[in-house]
Amino acid sequence: EALGTTSGSDDALPALAVIAALVLLLAAPAALRSVRARRLLLAARRGDAAAAWLVVQDTAIDLGIPVPASDTPRTLAARLAQSHGAPEAAMATLADALERASYAPSGTIAAGDHDALADAAAASSAALLRNAPVARRILAVIAPRSLVMRPGSAFAGAGTHARA
């Protein structure tokens, strides 16, 4: 090989580095959302009803389902069950637990209910994803809106679509 020439593999390294950086950049939102969901489900397993409810709200926001501040947990739970395929029993479990956590004396959620809380949140979130159109599901995974939009905000309340 003559002096001053480079092999083809040396020329490909910068391009591969750019491609690898782009892949990591594109995967970051999905990874952050996954970590957040796992952390919330872990908190739900410790009895945090608000964390369990937030798992479902985040999934709804990611799918473009409106989560307005004016909806009570029971109203949103009913709408997600009736219009978006969330399991009614799981949504009732979450709404009841959130109401108990908000209005009942502390310590009224039995330890055995903690797993049920996390299971209800996971089942509801999975059902919302499963019942959403494929394009909306893909967008929810690769560009989760819940990372920048909180439940009850003006943007979360508007959603991106309404399903009847």
Specify the residue positions occupied by each region the protein language model found.
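Flexible, solvent-exposed extracytoplasmic
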Residues: 1-4, 159
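Juxtamembrane/start-of-transmembrane alpha-helix segments at the extracytoplasmic/lumenal side
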Residues: 3-21
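Alpha-helical transmembrane segments
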Residues: 19-37
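Membrane-proximal, non-transmembrane interaction modules
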Residues: 24, 44-164
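Hydrophobic alpha-helical segments
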Residues: 37-43
